[in-house]
Every structure is written in structure tokens, then in C-alpha cells.
Amino acid sequence: MNYQSEWLRIDPIKGSRRFSNLCWAFILVLGAIGFSLVGFSSYLGRDLIPILSSQQIIFLPQGIVMCFYGIAGIFLGFYLWCTILWNVGSGYNQFNKREGIVYLFRWGFPGENRRICIRFMIKDIQAIRMEIQEGFSPRRVLYLRIKGQQDVPLTRLDEELTLREMEEKAAELARFLRVSIEGF
């Protein structure tokens, strides 16, 4: 859902609030609770949940390990749920020809640097660079090549674009900014 006019282009960026992250967070927390309950059940010597039998698990060392993994999983699940709640990584890329400025805005973790905003001049953009790595885990990323600076990624590293979609996106942006496209 991009917005584009003659002078302005805005590309929204999805953050961590995705269906796959929701599924992983839910599975992680359920598994961690299960591990914790089995570990505590082995300590108490009776089953806290009838479905999860702990009769054959000795508290030392298996029960302690189960508790440790359960607690670690709960902390990881809490972290994942927080990133989903805060939608870390979401934002937008704004290209404003009238002002001659590019704004890259992203939401970060709460605190002093929650809002991440990078600005630079359109005249400093040399090209749009496409990085394509095929194989077991393909990687397709668009970058802005800027004079005297490091390349700035425009898409998420794990964004699942087909080669055609990526080429179209790069061509539209290069046409809008009137710069060339470089492949890698």
C-alpha cells in the first residue's frame, strides 16, 4: 500500500507485528509453560497437570533442566510479545522531491531512541542497489547507495519478495528518483 504523487512517495515498512511472529510467540510460551510445569511437578512429586506426566522424571538433574528451559522460554516469549506489541522495525520510507529530502523512519524499542529517523538529500543518492542471493535461504534486499556513506537498506532483510516484485519495486523507485539501478 504505497502512496505516490508527482512530488512525494511513501513506502510503508512492516515491523515485527506479523502472523508468523504471533504464531512463534504463542508456541514458545505454551512450550515454556509446559516445561516449567513438568519441572515443578517432578519437584513436588505429583502431576500439576494430568496430561503432562512427570512420574519418570527425577528432579535432579532432569527436573531442574526442565525448569530452567521453561523459565528461559518464558523470558524469550515475553521479549517476543513485547516486540510484537511495540511493532519494532515498522515505519516508512518517504521520498520528497519538492524538499529534496529522503526520510527513513522506524520504530525501535521504548526508551530514548524509540523513534529512529534518518534524513539525507536526494541529490546525494547515487543509485538503487539490489542484492540478490539465491539458495537455501534466499536474500533479496534493496539499498540506497549514497555518496560518501554506507548503503542504506530500504527493505527488511527477511522480506519475502519474488525476483520480479523486487525488480519492479527497484525500477519504480529509480524512475521516481531518476537514478540508476545496480545489481549485486
From Swiss-Prot:
One of its GO terms (biological process) is photosynthesis. It is found in: Plastid, Chloroplast thylakoid membrane. It is a multi-pass membrane protein. GO terms for cellular component: chloroplast thylakoid membrane; photosystem I. Disulfide bonds: none annotated. Keywords: Chloroplast, Membrane, Photosynthesis, Plastid, Thylakoid, Transmembrane, Transmembrane helix. It holds the Pfam family Ycf4. Belongs to the Ycf4 family. This is Photosystem I assembly protein Ycf4. It comes from Angiopteris evecta.
